[in-house]
């Protein structure tokens, strides 16, 4: 693998045994180059607020590059299209709350320097860097699971590298084990999101 330059690990969202039914949905917070990481954290915290209100479990990790990834367990109960539409809805919620720094515009030139809320990674065959994957960038940064409270601290992508990730896992454990759990009941959480939307309109 080293000879081929295979540094990153980019798995599918589904297992071989259930290829059409993802184990989790991913919200990819993709900032433009030069964007203050504090803005990425602000958006992640807004997602956490929405998830908490709707009682949706969510797990955050660094991308290992510039952004953050938020994973939601789906339990291989829904198709890629259903999961993608669900994640798209969550992105709409947050995009409407933070329109000055967040966008769902696909074309980079039309994003106007905003952070892209990417739900399209939830398509069959699309991938993001795996949890604990090393990224092929200066410093050998690692895509690392976070406690949500760590977003309150002055964290940087460069805090998590190939040199210290083993020590972190020993001290914190594997924070991403739960993403392979039974998953959300989409019908129930959609009703919760509808209530949140209605209360906001009031």
How should these model regions be labeled?
Residues 39-51:
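Short amphipathic alpha-helix segments
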Residues 71-83:
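Catalytic palm subdomain of template-directed nucleic-acid polymerases
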Residues 58-64, 105-109:
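Short beta-strand
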Residues 63-72:
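Short, conserved phosphate-binding/catalytic loop or strand-edge motifs used
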Residues 4-25, 31-35, 46, 81-202:
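C-terminal accessory nucleic-acid interaction domains of nucleic acid-metabolism proteins
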Residues 48-62:
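Active-site palm subdomain of RNA-directed nucleic acid polymerases
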Residues 39, 62-64, 82:
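Short, contiguous, pocket-lining structural segments
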């Amino acid at each position: 693998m080293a000879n081929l330059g295979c540094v990153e690990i980019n798995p599918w969202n589904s297992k071989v045994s259930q290829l059409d039914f993802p184990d989790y949905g991913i919200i990819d917070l993709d900032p433009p180059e030069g964007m203050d990481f504090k803005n990425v954290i602000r958006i992640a915290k807004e997602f956490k607020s929405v998830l908490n209100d709707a009682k949706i479990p969510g797990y955050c990790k660094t991308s290992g590059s510039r952004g953050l990834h938020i994973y939601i367990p789906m339990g291989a109960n829904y198709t890629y299209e259903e999961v993608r539409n669900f994640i798209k809805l969550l992105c709409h919620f947050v995009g409407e709350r933070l329109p000055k720094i967040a966008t769902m515009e696909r074309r980079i030139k039309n994003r106007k320097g905003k952070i892209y809320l990417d739900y399209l990674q939830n398509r069959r065959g699309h991938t993001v860097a795996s949890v604990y994957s090393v990224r092929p960038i200066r410093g050998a940064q690692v895509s690392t699971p976070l406690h949500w409270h760590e977003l309150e601290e002055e964290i940087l992508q460069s805090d998590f590298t190939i040199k210290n990730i083993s020590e972190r896992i020993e001290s914190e454990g594997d924070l991403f084990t739960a993403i392979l759990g039974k998953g959300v009941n989409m019908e129930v959480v959609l009703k919760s999101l509808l209530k949140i939307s209605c209360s906001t309109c009031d």
